[in-house]
Amino acid sequence: MKIEKAQADFERLINKHSFTVTARTIDSGIPVYHRVWNRENETLEIRILLSGEYPLMTVRRNGAPDPKFIRDYRNPKSAFDTIRKIITAAGFEM
């Protein structure tokens, strides 16, 4: 996948799913996007950025990192498919 296509796909999915910029990487200033889902006793936060053509994602549950989801994905669509599965499994809606 070309970087331009990955960037366009990533931006489209970020906007479609209401992610917002929360920070920028120190070394290169790449925006880090996030979205938080809340309910009474549970918080789920997903942070994602695009490094070249590869999305990098982390998941935090109740403020603690969930290490099994700190990884990169081959393209924006596969990252957002995984996000959808995580959100659904946790009982939230995308």
Walk through the language-model features, giving the residues of each.
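Short aromatic-glycine-(Arg/Gly/Cys) micro-motifs in beta-strand/loop hairpins
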Residues: 49-64
